[in-house]
């Protein structure tokens, strides 16, 4: 009897864990869809169509809506103002299973970030030199904020007061005061910065320098680069692990995923081929999702052992910026 009760309890706990697992929403670029993945089973559970050339993606904090950017833009005609809307943001309602609306925007967008209160979505527009600010209360672009040449990636602090934008063409990171929507400071970044991730306490920013094959560590208080890690050619995606100290970084041209202990500096390497690309740690699961730039798949990697434990076969395209929603 006791053994039966124990078995039932374990099954119940397992079921509760599965129910509590996050959902991961993933844009598939050239496949023109966004998918939903159950992080407990790594199974694709939904597909949202007509999301054209989506690269960046965020979810509202309650998981009710997704906002995706697009690389697709219509060329401007001679004489048209530069701020003429010629691209799109897609507003997706997962419960309804489709794109609910589209928001016109000037210029293709690369990556997205959302404020913790779910009010604003910031999109980087690399060819325009600014971030656009979508107000989700009105579903309109409220403003644009010039940041520098080729803005790539945005981080927003947990308190919602500041945003940091990497400018690949300006070789810097800028800080935006979200109360005034003005750039208030310029930070070092290493050469041609792209993807970024905060340390757990937000005291440091880890930023990729793809051309230099390294990750720079920026002290947020001083704005100075205080350390760097040599990772390999064409570093791309990065994220911090569940333990708050392990940084996972992909190097496309060396076909590897690197796990860096940010306290000791020790590195572990996992070969992944071809071309590991975007990645996300899936908080609470011990997993890292790593996409391939060349094949429609995602490797599921165990954070502790750095071994591939599953592979998600995608319906097409390539996986880009992922949004993780905790159930």
Sequence positions of predicted segments:
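Predominantly soluble domains enriched in secretory-pathway, periplasmic, or organellar proteins
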Residues: 4, 10-327
């Amino acid at each position: 009897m006791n053994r039966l009760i124990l078995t039932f309890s374990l099954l119940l706990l397992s079921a509760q864990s599965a129910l509590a697992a996050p959902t991961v929403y993933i844009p598939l670029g050239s496949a023109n869809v966004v998918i939903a993945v159950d992080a407990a089973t790594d199974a694709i559970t939904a597909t949202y169509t007509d999301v054209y050339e989506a690269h960046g993606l965020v979810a509202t904090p309650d998981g009710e809506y997704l906002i995706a950017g697009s690389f697709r833009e219509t060329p401007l005609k001679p004489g048209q103002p530069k701020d003429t809307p010629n691209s799109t943001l897609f507003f997706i309602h997962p419960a309804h299973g489709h794109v609910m609306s589209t928001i016109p925007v000037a210029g293709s967008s690369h990556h997205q970030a959302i404020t913790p209160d779910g009010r604003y979505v910031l999109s980087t527009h690399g060819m325009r030199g600014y971030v656009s600010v979508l107000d989700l209360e009105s579903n309109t672009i409220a403003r644009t904020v010039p940041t520098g040449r080729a803005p790539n990636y945005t981080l927003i602090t947990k308190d919602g007061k500041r945003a940091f934008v990497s400018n690949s063409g300006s070789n810097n990171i800028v800080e935006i005061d979200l109360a005034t929507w003005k750039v208030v400071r310029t930070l070092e970044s290493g050469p041609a910065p792209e993807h970024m991730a905060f340390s757990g306490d937000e005291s440091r920013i880890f930023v990729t320098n793809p051309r230099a094959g390294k990750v720079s560590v920026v002290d947020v208080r001083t704005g100075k680069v205080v350390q760097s890690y040599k990772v390999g050619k064409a570093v791309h995606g990065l994220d911090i692990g569940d333990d708050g100290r392990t940084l996972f970084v992909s190097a496309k041209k060396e076909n590897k995923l690197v796990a860096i202990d940010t306290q000791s500096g020790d590195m572990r390497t996992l070969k992944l081929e071809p071309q590991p690309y975007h990645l996300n740690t899936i908080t609470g699961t011990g997993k890292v999702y790593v996409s391939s730039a060349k094949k429609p798949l995602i490797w599921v990697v165990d954070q502790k052992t750095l071994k591939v434990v599953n592979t998600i076969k995608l319906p097409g395209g390539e996986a880009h910026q992922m949004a993780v929603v905790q159930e």
